[in-house]
Structures are given as structure tokens and as C-alpha cells.
A protein has these predicted regions:
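The feature marks proteins involved in alpha-glucan
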Residues: 1-26, 54, 62-168
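Structural beta-strand segments of beta-rich domains
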Residues: 27-31
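Short proline/glycine-enriched turn/loop motifs at strand-loop junctions of beta-rich domains
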Residues: 35-40
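Beta-strand signatures of extracellular beta-sandwich domains
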Residues: 42-44
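Substrate-binding/active-site clefts of carbohydrate-active enzymes
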Residues: 145-322, 339-351, 355
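Conserved alpha/beta catalytic core and glycan-binding cleft of carbohydrate-active enzymes
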Residues: 344-437
Length: 437
């Protein structure tokens, strides 16, 4: 493994350009990837999205700051691709581009896409709903499949459990409004979608299987999950259908909040991060093992400059290409405070009304010091970033992990102070002894 002084390494190798990935422009396609310690990188082009029919493999040229580059003088819209990274002139890893914005079925191969061809009719005319104050947001949490999978949803059978179900109008069950017609009745301002970024554990090629996952097993952070598409083999299909979802909600003055899971990857050594540049994008303990602050086997290293850049670039892409209105960060406390504040600043440049909130806790112990992490008790260091309050939750019902830890409704009157503070929005109340909360 590589033992790096990450701060010095970042100073020497940080890349600040906004052109990593596959970029189409003026009849040519440019590919750039970052891997400073690679001794060779190759671009592999495929005819299909499963990586079975290779067209050609091209060596990439090394530029400054660890960037590898190749330019192809033709429009590759619809062509699939991967990279092969070579280390020490012998170890070779083929993988999807971590910056891929579209992919084939099951997310093993990236796709070059002209996003202008994915816009549904009327996409440019629909305006984002206004939310002038985040405190006014009324958020409805929703899983794409759960929203319409049952026949009682009233959605067309081919749309059940899919992105496009949100665009089906006039749906009812026994005279009662369902799906988007029901959402319109609720008075909500936003729908928070459980993860729609491409995740690992549902086989998109077998839609007839009864498969299900919440989506907290991230695989490709910039690609959409294909199991919610009516045809996952076509990269443009899931993009167009998700835009139809966003458009349908926006037409009814409902914003879209994405649940983002940048804190870990489902795979560790086999992840695209590790295959692109081993031991950089994840946090590593002093003994060389992967730290596990997520409780899922690893945690990403937002304090490393190029992981931070990846998160910022990814969020900027979702906010601009898909007109997303908010981001909910899973296990946000695994990200360092500096990164969280930079993200807020970058989102403000796009739209100050974009919501940003997350979980102010971790799923395990992180090697990064607690005073640098975005824990809820460090919230005074954030600007316009909300946090979930598990204190009020536990004060009402009791502890989450200990069945004998009672809450107020179970007779624990000692929880009253915490409950009162939560009802008041956790605003500091100086007569309260916070050391006992």
C-alpha cells in the first residue's frame, strides 16, 4: 500500500479544473481522470453497457497534477467506456470512471451522453419552486419504488416503482387520490427521495425478481439508479425519466431533495475509488486498514482535497443538470466541517435556496478528530446547514439501541428537559444544564 503524507501530497497534486470525466464539445470527446501514482492509464471504449464488446483501448497522456488525458476527434454520444489503471508497471485495474455521469446496466461501465438530448419536452420552461426560508420547508420522505409499486397506487402497470410514476396524473384508489395527486393535497413543500444515485445490491438486469434496497449502498455517485428506470440498458432512459419526475413535482410547486451518501462506498477494495487510486479516497488507520466510521466497512476522506473536490463537483452536477432543490447528507458527521461549509458556499453560488441538511452523527469511530467532524454539537460552526435531532426523538420514545432506555412517553420524566429544548427548536436556553441533556 501507499503511505502518504496526505496534506503534502494534496499540495503537490491537487487539480482545480472542472473538466474531469468525459466531456463532449465541438465534435470531439475529451476524457480526463486523476491518478498521480499510476504508471499508465488506458481508455477502453465499448459498444455495449455490459463491457462485452470492446471497440478499442487507447493510452492516455499524463499531464500536470496527476491528470491523465486523451482526446478523440469524434462525437461519442452513446458510446460506453472504462479506464484501466496501471500501478508499478504491473498491477492493472479496469474500472468505471468515478466521474461517469451515466452508465450501463448495473453500473459497471460508464457512458458518454449528450445531456441536451435527455431533456423532456418543457424541461427548460418549468421553474423551480421558491423556498425563501429553510424553516418554512415541509419535507415528505419517499422511496421511489414504494411510492407506486403496489397496484393500489393507480399508476400504469409499466410505471409502478419507477421514476415516471411521479408524472402519472389523476391516479386514484377507490376514489381516493394517490401518488402525486395525494402529495398535492398534503401541503408539503419538498419531497425527499431516498437515494437515487446508482447503488450496488439490486440487479437491474432482472426486474422480475422481488428485489429491494433503501439505496444506502452507493456504487456510482454521479449516475442514476437503473432499477427505477423502465429500461436500464439505455443510459439516457433513466436520465430522461428522472427529469420527468423532477419536472412533475416542480410543476406542482414541490421541490426535490436528494439523499446523498458520500460517506462510504458499498465496495471497498473493489470500488472505483480504490481501483483509480488506492488508499486515497478512503480514510486509512495507522495500521494500514480501512477505517469504518460508517459502520459499513469503510469511510470516505472528505478532508483529502480531491475527495472534497469530487463531492463538490458531484453536487454541482446534480443541482444544475437536474435542478435539485436540496440535499440530505447521510452520516454527515463523517465529513469534516471545512468541507461542509465549502459545499454550502458552492451551493449558494448556484441557488441560495437549495436546502442542505444531514445526520449529525457517525456509524462508528473515525480517525479524524471529533472537533473537525460535522457532528451535531459542532453545528455552531456551520452556516445554513441543518441537522437531524435524534435527542428529541430519543427523549420521546427512548433509546434506539437499548430497549431499557425509556423515553418521556414511557414514564422517564428525566427526559423532560431534553424534550422541551427539542420542541423549542434546540435554541440555547441558559437555565438548562446542557451537560445533563
Amino acid at each position: 500500500m501507499y503511505r502518504l503524507n496526505y496534506e503534502q501530497f494534496d499540495r503537490d497534486n491537487q487539480y482545480i479544473g472542472n473538466d474531469l470525466g468525459a466531456i463532449m464539445k465541438e465534435g470531439k470527446t475529451v476524457f480526463k481522470t486523476w491518478s498521480p501514482l499510476a504508471t499508465g492509464v488506458y481508455l477502453n471504449l465499448y459498444l455495449d453497457g455490459e463491457g462485452k464488446s470492446r471497440l478499442e483501448s487507447l493510452p492516455m497522456e499524463r499531464l500536470d497534477h496527476g491528470v491523465w488525458y486523451v482526446e478523440i476527434l469524434r462525437d461519442l454520444d452513446g458510446v460506453f467506456y472504462t479506464y484501466t489503471f496501471e500501478f508499478d508497471h504491473k498491477t492493472r485495474h479496469e474500472t468505471i470512471d468515478i466521474y461517469a455521469k451515466a452508465c450501463g446496466v448495473n453500473g459497471n461501465v460508464g457512458a458518454v451522453v449528450n445531456f441536451k438530448t435527455t431533456d423532456p419536452e418543457g424541461w427548460d420552461k418549468v421553474k423551480k419552486p421558491k423556498c425563501r426560508n429553510a424553516c418554512d420547508a415541509v419535507v415528505y420522505e419517499c422511496h421511489v419504488r414504494d411510492f407506486s409499486a403496489d397496484s393500489s397506487s393507480g399508476v400504469a402497470s409499466e410505471h409502478r416503482g419507477k421514476y415516471v410514476a411521479f408524472a402519472d396524473k389523476g391516479t386514484k384508489y377507490q376514489g381516493v387520490n394517490t401518488c402525486i395527486e395525494h402529495l398535492k393535497e398534503l401541503g408539503i413543500t419538498h419531497v425527499h427521495l431516498l437515494p437515487v444515485e446508482d447503488y450496488a445490491t439490486v440487479d437491474e438486469s432482472k426486474p422480475w425478481l422481488n428485489q429491494y434496497n433503501w439505496g444506502y449502498d452507493p456504487k456510482n455517485f454521479n449516475c442514476l439508479e437503473g432499477s427505477y428506470s423502465t429500461y436500464p440498458y439505455d443510459p439516457k432512459c433513466r436520465i430522461r425519466e428522472f427529469k420527468q419526475l423532477v419536472m412533475a413535482l416542480h410543476e406542482n410547486s414541490i421541490g426535490v431533495v436528494m439523499d446523498v451518501v458520500y460517506n462510504h462506498t458499498y465496495y471497498t477494495e473493489e470500488s472505483a475509488f480504490e481501483r483509480s487510486f488506492p488508499y486515497y479516497y478512503h480514510r486509512i488507520r495507522n495500521d494500514g486498514s480501512f477505517s469504518n466510521g460508517s459502520g459499513c466497512g469503510n469511510e470516505t476522506a472528505s478532508n483529502h482535497m480531491m475527495m472534497r473536490k469530487f463531492m463538490i463537483d458531484s453536487l454541482r452536477f446534480w443541482a444544475t443538470e437536474y435542478k435539485i432543490d436540496g440535499f440530505r447528507f447521510d452520516l454527515m458527521a463523517l465529513h469534516d466541517i471545512e468541507t461542509v461549509n465549502i459545499i454550502r458556499d458552492e451551493l449558494n453560488k448556484i441557488d441560495p435556496q437549495i436546502l442542505m441538511y444531514g445526520e449529525g452523527w457517525t456509524g462508528g469511530e473515525s480517525p479524524l478528530p471529533a472537533d473537525r467532524l460535522a457532528y451535531k454539537w459542532n453545528s455552531y460552526q456551520f452556516g445554513r446547514v441543518g441537522l437531524f435531532n435524534d435527542n428529541i426523538r430519543d427523549s420521546i420514545k427512548g433509546g434506539t439501541f437499548n430497549p431499557y432506555d425509556k423515553g418521556f412517553v414511557s414514564g422517564n420524566r428525566n427526559a423532560a428537559s431534553t424534550l422541551r429544548r427539542g420542541i423549542a427548536g434546540s435554541v440555547p436556553h441558559y437555565p438548562v444544564s446542557y451537560t445533563h441533556l
